[in-house]
Amino acid sequence: MKYTEFEIISKYFKRNQKKDVNEIKGIGDDSALIKIPKNNILAISTDTLVEGTHFLKNISPEDLGYKTVAVNLSDLAAMGAEPKWTTLSITMPESNNIWLKKFSSSFFKILNKYNVRLIGGDTNRGSLSITLSMYGLLKKQIALLRSNANIGDLIYVTGTLGESAAGLFLLKKNIFIKNVNIRNYLIKKHLNPIPRVSEGMALRKIANAAIDLSDGLIADLDHILNDSQCGANINLNKIPISKVLIDNFQSQNYLNWALNVGEDYELCFTISKKNIDKLKIIKKKFLVNFTCIGYITPIEQGFNLFDNQKKIIFKKKGFNHFD
């Protein structure tokens, strides 16, 4: 049995989620109505995921439902915003009830984990693509902007880098690894990234600039440098690489994955040296590591990578939709 557009919305996407006090009208009308609390501003992020470009054709509906939400949460995390609401638009070749049930179940599972409510959306027929808009709140004057880095700031990243790219290459069979547990771990890092929402909210009062690492460290950090009109010195030996990658792959592979491939969805942020003691206190609250990889310099000095004090020549590349 195939459902109509409105039957799909009613059956799979109209859930009895915990209501938000600022939500006047949610899903089910021509538009949602939201009240913005006093002294707050609204952070808005939108991502479109297209089959064959952002996810492989054989991805499970459960993994796609999770990742659709996770990558948008990561954008809000980079601003220091608290995620509150979302809208979803799905274009798909046909009304597949089994697919919709699995997708929506995973989709709402991660929404509920982060206390986010679905307040609207749309369904259409066509090649599989998903567009999600995420809305979050934060107090005025404390957003983590890409343009706020200052000369002398230290540059930090959360977690480890390169594992998502390794998982992608395993899925595409560009590399092979015998250990099934390690293989599954890396693939999960690609399909089920952890958005650093709590970390972003904790950093918003002490960090200066931030970005989530979706396109690779070099490309994403370069956005901060361009917007802040600064340069940077990065030490390759300080980039956090997991023992899993070091033990199972060559260094040129995992460094390239960390620098250029992306989809780690960790946070890269800059912070003044005077706030390092505050950062140490924050670090104790989280299981994830915070690693200093370099510092911000005057724009005239450019963007530099060093390997044991030896300057490395590199190209500023990363994921680009139109390459």
UniProtKB/Swiss-Prot annotation:
Binding site for Mg(2+) 3: 30, 75, 212
Catalytic activity: thiamine phosphate + ATP = thiamine diphosphate + ADP
Keyword annotations of the record: ATP-binding, Kinase, Magnesium, Metal-binding, Nucleotide-binding, Thiamine biosynthesis, Transferase
GO BP annotations listed: thiamine biosynthetic process; thiamine diphosphate biosynthetic process
Keyword Protein biosynthesis belongs to the record: no
Binding site for ATP: 121-122, 146, 214
Binding site for Mg(2+) 4: 30, 45, 75
GO terms of molecular function: ATP binding; magnesium ion binding; thiamine-phosphate kinase activity
InterPro entries: PurM-like_C_dom, PurM-like_C_sf, PurM-like_N, PurM-like_N_sf, ThiL-like
Residues annotated to bind Mg(2+) 1: 46-47, 122
Keyword Transferase: yes
Uppermost EC category: transferase
Enzyme nomenclature, EC number: 2.7.4.16
Binding site for Mg(2+) 5: 215
Entry similarity comment: Belongs to the thiamine-monophosphate kinase family.
PANTHER family named in the record: THIAMINE-MONOPHOSPHATE KINASE (PTHR30270:SF0)
Miscellaneous: Reaction mechanism of ThiL seems to utilize a direct, inline transfer of the gamma-phosphate of ATP to TMP rather than a phosphorylated enzyme intermediate.
HAMAP family cross-referenced by the UniProt entry: TMP_kinase
Summary of the function given for this chain in its UniProt record: Catalyzes the ATP-dependent phosphorylation of thiamine-monophosphate (TMP) to form thiamine-pyrophosphate (TPP), the active form of vitamin B1.
Listed name of the protein: Thiamine-monophosphate kinase
Organism per entry: Buchnera aphidicola subsp. Acyrthosiphon pisum (strain APS) (Acyrthosiphon pisum symbiotic bacterium)
